[in-house]
Amino acid sequence: MDMAPDELDELRGSAQRALEQAIDFSFSCQQDDGHWVAPVSADATFTAQYVMFKHAIPALNLDISGAEAAALRHWLLGDQNAAEGSWGLAPGLPGNLSTTVEAYLALRLLGVPSSNPALQQARRFVLAHGGISRVRFFTRFFLATFGLFPWSAIPQMPAELILMPKWAPLNIYVLSSWARSTLIPILVVRHHEPLYPLPNAQSDPNSGFLDELWLDPTNKEVPFAPPLWDMFHGRDRDVVKLAFTLGDKALAQIGGLKKGPQRRLALRRCIEWLLEHQEETGDWAGFFPPMHGSVWALLLEGFSLEHDVVKRGLEALERLAVNDESGKWLQSTVSPCWDTALMVKALCDAGLGLGGAEAAKGNRHARVTTAVDWVRSLQLLGPQGDWRVYSRNQRPGGWSFEYNNTWYPDVDDTAVVVMMLVTHDPAAVESNAVEMGIEWILGMQNHDGGWGAFDTNNDALWLHKIPFSDMDSLVDPSTSDVTGRMLECFGMLLTHRKGGLRLRPELSQRLHESAQKALAFLFREQTASGAWWGRWGCNYNYGTTNVLRGLPAFCGDKEVARAALRAVLWLEKCQNKDGGWGETLLSYGHPDLAGKGPSTAAHTAWALDALLRFRPASDPALQKGVQWLVSNQVPKTEEKRHWASWPSDLYVGTGFPNVLYLGYPFYHHHFAISALARFLDRTDEPDQDRDLPLLMTRHVVTTLTRHDILLMVLGSRGDIDVFLSIAGKLAKNRHRVRVATHPAHQQLVEAHGFEFYDVGGGPDEFAQVLGREPNLLWSVIRGDLGRLRQSLCRTFARFWEAGYGSNNTRNARNADPKANGIADSRPFVADLIVSTPATTVHVHAAETLRAPLVLIAAQPTLPTREFPHVFTMNKPRYSPGSWWNYATFFFLELLNWLAMGSFVNKLRVHTYKMKPLCWVWATQDFLTAKIPLVCLWSSNVVPRPPEWHDEVMVAGSTTLAQVDQFTPPLSLLEFLNADMEKPTVVVSFGSMFIADPPALISAIASAAAQVRAKVVICRSWRWKLESSLASLPSHTYVADAIPHSWLLPRVDGFVHHGGAGHTAAGLRAGVPMLITPFFLDQHFWAAKVHNLGLGPEPLEIMMRAGTVAGIQTHQGKMQFAQSMQDLLSGQYSRRCAEMSERVRAETDGANVAADVIERELGSALARSGHCAVVPALPAQWQHAESGLALCGVAAASLVTSGMLDWDDLDAITRIDWIARRQKDPKSRLHAICFVADWLGHAFGMLLAVAGWLLQLVGDVRSVGRVKPHHNTDPIRLAMMERSMFDLNFAKQGLAEAELKGGAFEELLARRWRAAVAAAFERRMERTGNMLLGEGCQG
């Protein structure tokens, strides 16, 4: 709701006062020579390594009883996370194992005993996370220098790498600038393998120092790389990584090339390189690791501490140290050029540039000009620069990040400096400094159209397979955030008109050409949600806002406008309830957290500055964001502590994702100045946006762009749980989710807030029929499956109708209460279908809806030689590699088509007016079609077979979170806590049909009594057992549904039927499993669990037709008891725990599935485009004559006004399934099908003639081409109904605006006429050009 004029005036006044306070603080911390710089915070790694270095070199005088050591101790202990005793990568993040070990060692070197409570707490954290053997490479490397790791456990790093020519695939210049400058000195250190004394004067791996951090201190020879077999064949299979590891092992066998004649030459080249790259001030690359490593390498090569190079290097290292009230700590780098350029640009945005309204106050103008001159003087115009090695441009002109870094100018810094210069003085657009800076930026563009930070085309990602690369930071590829900054800079220069000054035409043309390549790169990088990933700032917020600031100058292009709109809507959706924006650094490892986190001034300012380029200042969301900045500004007395006018405690800068995060306090300051200044400028402008796009923002646009996603679920409770987990992820992105499934699941679906659609049938039907014959293949052959056909036909028809039909139950509730009315009343037409493979009609429904399809499988369904189709197994064993395995997939699909194909074709032809399909499509084309398939099981259990296509992802398992909602009965707790010396076993057979539950309970209780165990039996069958339960033995407990995630961690064994959900729960809990398979995929999972050593051999004595005859015999009872004894023997516990750890470390499969769904949906919407009349809305229709796309609102309005008829419009095709089938390669089977099809045509014609002659009316199947009937197409009718709804809803949303009566329709009609005229003008122009070309050829 818009603010009243007096409220807006009050907000403007508050924003102006906040801006003034921030400007005053800016000048209060300006340095004497005009520049700005604030300390750059990081984790404890750099301070800890500084302590190690000074301890290793006694001449550096680190006296543990002195003031310096006390200050270092004080800071390290103060940086510890008190809650868990760890040291993390940034405030608010969980502890990091490697950082904690480094801090622990540093404190021990500083004299803190291991008995210190802080170190005791740290020790517990380290051991809980696997111990010291699991630290990253560089931590292991530093530990080796003190003998705490044997050098033989450190990967080889041959110094000969420096000798590789620049054209070689592997040489120092294919590494990123930071990796190159860090690695070269480390090559020297690795050659020397130094061993420095510890406080107890020991440097022997067996000395016992730090043994308290090892799980097994007797074995420190722990390989860094995973086992070779895993890289060759296991879940970590990677040929490149395997080759590097084999090379490393081969080098180790021959002594790492140390004794070769080339080693001395290599070391000399390393030292020459270091000497060449040292700055006059002693710095190397302006970054702690190369500065620290270079001094270290020189000392090992015989340079004395008094040598000028070493002295200057040590002085540069000390300049990174900060002494404040928290103690002494080390910065990773310093950022004066970056800080100053951004600060000046912000101040100029606030009117302090030349001629600005604020510049005349006091001496502000002079102080800003001094800062500009200071930055300008840092332009790098000399011959240095590693960027020259591969850049096609050899002309210098960039700026670096730090005071002294002539070798590594920064693309990002250079663009900001150029914008700063032009913002301060419009005449600078024609200056040499700006032109040379732009020339240098153009020369640094990568072949993919984007920009990295320091190098060109530095994108050899395979380098991350090198054994010592565990931080994924060896290269500097193109990133969206840097590329967006370049476009912002280009856009400013291309639209610059102040004072009649502009860029040279030749340079402008080059900027345009470069920008087109950059835009193409950004289109490829945009995520399905509309956001962009941020490499150098946290994270999707930073990446997205950087790009958005670069797009306005190019939004004349429709593709740019669409990309911008998607990003704007995503950013608006991420706003927190308090009005601000924030994002946790955890989003780098968990993309589902993108845009989520506590509000910060930096994130809020980034969002506001970007959105104010697309939305008016009157937008309520933006005003709420400005109010957050105003309300959260710190008092003036607190500014110096924060180095900002807003809280700066949370880090928002990124060094290396998931490895190093940086705290730039000025980020929370100067970006907020720019945002407030832009808001105030926009409120001064006349509101020129009172046109349709902005009237339809927020409520209307958000509602009408909310996508309909249909989930088709056929199966048991375990199957529906998986889909509800996925539905929860989709609902968070504000999609409308409809779950079509059996009525047995209605209560569960609606309890989770999703719309339910009843398709009939139920899992009990399957269990009763298939329990008689476990092998589905034989069930089909024997005809047993015919009992299900009639029910399945009804169910499949309803699945199809669920994609467009009105809700057949009125109890559906939406998770978003604000959209509840719209979700219930807006006609549903699926924009995307998500289905289990078993629903059969999924691809046909997707074809009729012209919508993308994503399949979700809980068991393997694509052909492979690794195992047979799981539905054809009747024993828990199989032979890998058999041709029969591969054939079973096609054979089963053929039988399925023989059973259901005629019904499917009948629906296709008669109901949906589509062509029928041949059996070859079902048995070959569908199985080999590249339809996205997400496999929800762990790759540790079933790795991805090599035969499967690229669109198949083994995503990991998923669970439906229920623990927080579950309150266990008191009787259950008492049962579990009683007789603790007895092991407890859980027995659950899921949705299996049990004909005689009392007999089953009796058999289970008897077996448990024989092995002296307690047993919890989870029932799901419908049977009144109250009389039987009263006489249960004391060691038996029968319960209804209990969440596996709550119960399984509390027991010692798990007996179940082998369902995919039960198996995944057992794997996650790490509990040994005994599987008694009934039918279908249960035999497959039973075989897998046993083969992996996670439980005893499966029991094959269980039920047929739901009976328990197998275990009621004496032999059956004995076998059941023996298997249960084996289950509880403890021999499977270790393997189960290891598997649990691996499974838990995997990404939640539901997150992967949601990402795939978002990607497919985004791609489909991008193909359909946006409305030619209302660009804010996606297209649903296409005008046949002009080819113009229309949204539902525009189409319904034009039809209602009589300008168009519905027959003039075709539904937009988001995915062309017909064309997709035609692209599939043909086989001999297609030739057979063609002949059969031809004969069918002939036979059909004979039947038609006979029917006409005899005037017979029958169900004669048409096999020819079907012409669509617009008036009877149910999906088209549903789309028309939705379009009329959208029109009425949009008009209601505009009721309070100036467009009343027929003005809305009149505006749409005017836009339509203009769009049609423009379309025909373009067509005539193309026709004229073609005729002109033909005339010239004549």
Curated annotation (Swiss-Prot):
A single GO molecular-function term is: sterol 3-beta-glucosyltransferase activity
User: Its domain of life?
Assistant: Eukaryota
Which Pfam family, any one of them, does this sequence belong to? SQHop_cyclase_N
Give EC number(s), comma-separated: 5.4.99.-, 2.4.1.-
Region Glycosyltransferase, as annotated, extends over 688-1338
Site feature (Transition state stabilizer) residues: W338, F401, W536
Q: Which SUPFAM superfamilies match?
A: Terpenoid cyclases/Protein prenyltransferases, UDP-Glycosyltransferase/glycogen phosphorylase
Q: Which reaction does it catalyse?
A: (S)-2,3-epoxysqualene = isomotiol; isomotiol + UDP-alpha-D-glucose = 3-O-(beta-D-glucopyranosyl)-isomotiol + UDP + H(+); 2alpha-hydroxyisomotiol + UDP-alpha-D-glucose = 3-O-(beta-D-glucopyranosyl)-2alpha-hydroxyisomotiol + UDP + H(+)
Gene Ontology biological process terms in this record: carbohydrate metabolic process; lipid glycosylation; triterpenoid biosynthetic process
What GO cellular-component annotations does this UniProt entry give? lipid droplet
Q: Tell me the keywords, alphabetical order.
A: Isomerase, Repeat, Transferase
Show me the PFTB repeat boundaries. 19-61, 69-111, 267-307, 434-475, 515-556, 564-615
- Give the record's biotechnology entry: Fuscoatroside and some of its derivatives show interesting antifungal activity against Candida albicans and Aspergillus niger.
NCBIfam families, A to Z: hopene_cyclase (TIGR01507), squalene_cyclas (TIGR01787)
Into which family does the record put it? Answer: In the N-terminal section; belongs to the terpene cyclase/mutase family. In the C-terminal section; belongs to the glycosyltransferase 28 family.
Q: Could you tell me what this protein is called?
A: Terpene cyclase-glycosyl transferase fusion protein fsoA
Q: Whose protein is this, by species?
A: Humicola fuscoatra
